Amino acid sequence: MFALLSHKLLSRNMQNAKHFVLVHGSCLGAWCWYKLVALLRHAGHRVTALDLGGSGIHSNQIHEVTSIWDYVQPLMEFLGSIPEDEKVILVGHSYGGLPISLAMEMFPQKISVAVFVTAYLPHYTFPPGVLIQEFLKRTSAESLLDCQFTFGQNNPENQLTSVLFGSQYMAAKLYQHCKPEASFLTLPQIKS
């Protein structure tokens, strides 16, 4: 009886199951979603957490990502590969708002909803470059601790081309409220 009831509940959950596509923010990777992936899968949903170009375990190194299109390519390829009649729920965190916005424009028929989790929402008066420039103007160098910034590679305007969060910055600014083991898990995942 219990097995039959469990099967019926699972079947009902599978009928209502959604496909979530999780997009990380700057300097992170698919790994940062590990707790949410487990919760969503436990609830019967399909989950895809992607590493964007030069992030996480993606095969490209950060210096090989020379444009926003290099960065978002894994997301675009994934969305291009799903069946035309399938719709996903896109979830972007922080700078992940930009890739999901681009995906919404390129694949509107494949996206049921997009969720911006404290994420960048593009606007024509505030392109990403302006947002980053304003952040750097208003932020003291000391508060950035051991972050690394690369400027001017492959662009004549000497714009910011890459950011790498340092371990001190992550411990003090990103994971200060987490258990020590959670921040320890992130360190090997940050690319240099």
Residue ranges and their predicted role:
Residues M1-H19, V65, S81-E84, A141-P156:
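Eukaryotic N-terminal low-complexity, Ser/Thr- and Lys/Arg-rich leader segments
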Residues E105, Q109-N158, S167:
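Flexible "cap/lid" loop of the alpha/beta hydrolase fold
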Residues L22-S26, H93-S94, A119:
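Glycine-rich His-Gly loop
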Residues P156-S192:
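Conserved alpha/beta-hydrolase catalytic His-Asp/Glu region
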Residues R46-T48, L52-I89, L102-K110, F126-K137:
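Active-site loop/oxyanion-hole signature of alpha/beta-hydrolase fold enzymes
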Residues V91-G96, I100:
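Gly/Ala-rich beta-loop-alpha elbow adjacent to hydrolase catalytic centers
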Residues R12-N60, E77-S81, D85-E86:
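Conserved HGGG/HGGXW glycine-rich cap/lid loop of the alpha/beta-hydrolase fold
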